[in-house]
């Protein structure tokens, strides 16, 4: 097939989509704005509901990137239609003509301080699950 496909977002969904596209004969170009691939999963220690280590899911994915062009610390500068393809320009100065664009941009965590009634940001012992995961992952005890 040898057609380029841009995958925007380098979390687990973007990585897996890129791997599947590669296996189908496409040339995936994976673009992630963060300094590393993995998204939120890279920050977490354990996964609900079984408590499996996040690294046991993510690490094998990251070790299977052969044939995938990927860029970190990179954003999409522009996307323009050109007949039956797209021209995608990246913030690193590169551009690619692609057959398709796949959005796998993930999610942002809820800003808990917006709900004052929960006490987050007011009482030091009120934390979010994301805070707890950071502590578990780092091995550091909360202050």
Model regions: which residues?
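Residues forming the flavin
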Residues: 1-143
